């Protein structure tokens, strides 16, 4: 994962790889689950969600990082790419010793209708937005449109109280330098 660069169609001043992105998504997903549990009486397994998030891009080991405009160009491409991702995950799981396949399968193949999946998707969008914030903060205007698009996508997740709380409490701090943090 560390060899797979993200944002392939963008001139990134701070390159990011899939391993770095996955770690940040896991941290954010873990935070969202903890917020749900501590602030809003949730009963989520935050550690399991963090682990699922850590592996959310596993298929990219074989597929690479397909740029978002291509992946979401139309429903037919999106559906076909979902199939490719599943085949890649299945191939990777088949490479494992038999006794590990079920355990890894449970964290790699997350039910797309589950609350956990939604939280990981929200965390994924937040992490991508943070990347855009970082790039635009240092003057890279190439990330401006992606930043606006991701902000709108995050807003659609704000109906979930833990996402709203995370965004209201933490999101603005990602645009600050270390010296600006209080």
Regions flagged by a language model, labelled:
Residues 1-182:
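Alpha-helical, largely C-terminal catalytic domains
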